[in-house]
Amino acid sequence: MTVLRGAFTGWVDVLRAGIDTNMNDPDPNARIYKGENGNGRFFVDYCNWDRIAEYKNFIFNSNAAHIGAALMNSQNVQLFHEHVLVKEASTDVPTPWHQDAPYYCVTGPKTVSLWVPLDTIERDTTLEFVSGSHLWGKHFRPQRFDGSALNEDDGLEEIPDINQHRDEYEILGWAVEPGDAIAFDYRTIHGAAGNHQPNRQRRAFSLRLVGDGARFVRRDGLVSSPPFPNLTLKSGDPLTGDTFPFLLHA
C-alpha cells in the first residue's frame, strides 16, 4: 500500500457534494451503524455511481484510472464499484479489521482500492494496514461492520485478533488531508478506529478498480458484497457489461 499526497485535491468539493446527495437519498443497501451508547452514526453505501453525477464525473474524468493502471501495472482498468464511508462526529464505531477480496464476486491478479479522505484525518483515526498481509495467501471470513459474519459457513477462518496482538504485526497508517489517497490491494488486511473528533466528520470515498485478468466468481450459497443481484455472468467469465465499465482499454 502507499499514500498519494494531493492526488485528488481538485475533486474534493465534487465528491463532498456527491456524498451529500447520497446521504440524503441512500440506496436500499446502505447501512447505518450506531455506537455502543447510540452516539454518532457510521454511514456506508456503495454502487451509486450511475445515479450520482458527482461520483460518475470523478470516476470517468479524474486521473484515478491512470493512477490505478500505474499501480497495478495494467493496460486495462475497470470499475468494480465505489464505496462511501462516513463517520460522523463523535462516532465510536470502528471499522473492523478485514480484507476486501473475500466479500467480492471478482478475482484477479491486479486489484487496487483508492481510499480518498474528504476531511483531515489524524493518525489515530486513519485507515490502518497490516503490512504484507496481501501476500499471506489467505482469505479470512468477511464480516459486516457490526462484527456479524457475512456468511456463517463459508469455510474460511476467522481473521486474527489484530488489536490484541498489534506488536506482532507491522501496522502502517498515515495522517491524511482532503484529496490525498491511500492505495491498497484487495487482499490487504485493514481497519480503522472510530471518529472521536467532536466537531468533524470523517468522510471517505473509496474507488475499487480491477486490471488485466479480472474474472467473475460466483460463490454459490454465499452472500457477496456488493451483491450485484442482476448479473448473469458465470464463474470464470471476464467482467463485462455496463456494471463494470472500462475506464482504460488497451
Indicate residue ranges for each PLM-predicted region.
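Short, solvent-exposed loop/turn segments at secondary-structure junctions
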Residues: 8-10, 85-86, 102, 120-121, ...
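Short, charged/polar surface micro-motifs in flexible loops or helix N-caps
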Residues: 64, 89-91, 120-123, 135, ...
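Double-stranded beta-helix
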Residues: 122-189
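Non-heme Fe(II)/2-oxoglutarate
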Residues: 28-29, 34, 140-145, 178-183, ...
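Short, structured patches in soluble enzyme cores that scaffold and shape functional sites
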Residues: 83, 99, 116-120, 129-131
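Short, conserved beta-strand element in jelly-roll/cupin
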Residues: 105-122, 175, 183, 208-212
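Non-heme Fe(II)-dependent double-stranded beta-helix
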Residues: 2-97, 103-104, 142, 229-231, ...
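Glycine-rich phosphate/pyrophosphate-binding beta-alpha loops
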Residues: 100-102, 111, 191-196
